[in-house]
């Protein structure tokens, strides 16, 4: 039952994503714009760009995910789908988890694929790329899960884009610190395993708690 519900929701979301494929490209284009602006602002000095490349790439991915966060549940709230979720024979937290996975796949996964190209724009040293990809692979799902809780808290409010950002950014800061810090540690010849393990631990905790918290927030918003 839960697997069939997940397949149905993913199929619906993929159809909606295809119909709004122009909107789905916005996070990737925004991240590219952030990287290009940093490259232009810092000049053509490769050493200066390489020094800030991990932080810039992490910041670009974070802001790109934040751009699409307000729409995570808003469309479903407007067309009545969230009420159907609450009446579905599967747990609400499961549908929230599936939707969050879809959000990660549409906003963060393309950026993970494009990270080597974006790293070349910033002269990222090749030996730092595996650590950067590992930190993004662990950190971006964590960002999506934290963002789902914030989006659920504000789903009943109109024009809550700024409020979503204000609530989400403080939660994102530790992920950004450990994600960019792992690459900085590798650049200094230190072991980045500690920061990566902290990201992994945060992801495991968020996988358990974030869908439950988001589901509770949706129930409160619709009650």
Briefly describe each language-model feature range:
Residues 97-122, 142, 146, 179-180:
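Hydrophobic alpha-helical transmembrane segments that constitute the membrane-spanning cores
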Residues 133-152, 204-205, 209:
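Hydrophobic alpha-helical transmembrane segments of polytopic membrane proteins
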Residues 66-86:
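Transmembrane helix boundary and interhelical loop/hinge segments in multi-pass membrane proteins
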Residues 41-52, 116-137, 155, 183-198, ...:
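Membrane-interfacial helix-loop-helix connectors in multipass membrane proteins
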Residues 53-69, 73:
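Long, hydrophobic alpha-helical segments
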Residues 21-43, 58-61, 167, 171-178, ...:
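Hydrophobic alpha-helical transmembrane segments of multi-pass membrane transport/permease proteins
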């Amino acid at each position: 039952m839960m697997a069939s519900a997940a397949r149905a929701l993913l199929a619906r979301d993929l159809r909606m994503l295809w119909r709004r494929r122009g909107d789905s490209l916005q996070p990737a284009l925004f991240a590219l714009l952030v990287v290009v602006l940093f490259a232009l602002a810092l000049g053509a000095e490769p050493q200066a760009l390489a020094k800030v490349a991990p932080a810039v790439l992490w910041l670009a991915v974070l802001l790109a995910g934040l751009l699409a966060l307000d729409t995570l549940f808003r469309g479903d709230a407007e067309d009545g789908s969230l009420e159907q979720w609450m009446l579905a024979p599967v747990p609400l937290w499961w549908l929230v988890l599936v939707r969050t996975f879809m959000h990660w796949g549409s906003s963060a996964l393309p950026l993970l694929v494009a990270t080597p190209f974006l790293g070349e724009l910033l002269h990222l040293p090749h030996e730092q790329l595996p650590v950067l990809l590992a930190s993004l692979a662990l950190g971006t799902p964590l960002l999506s899960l934290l963002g789902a809780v914030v989006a659920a808290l504000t789903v009943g409010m109109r024009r809550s884009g700024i409020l979503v950002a204000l609530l989400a950014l403080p939660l994102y800061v530790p992920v950004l610190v450990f994600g960019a810090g792992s690459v900085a540690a590798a650049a200094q010849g230190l072991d980045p395993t500690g920061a990566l393990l902290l990201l992994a631990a945060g992801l495991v905790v968020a996988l358990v708690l974030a869908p439950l918290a988001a589901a509770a927030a949706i129930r409160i918003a619709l009650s």
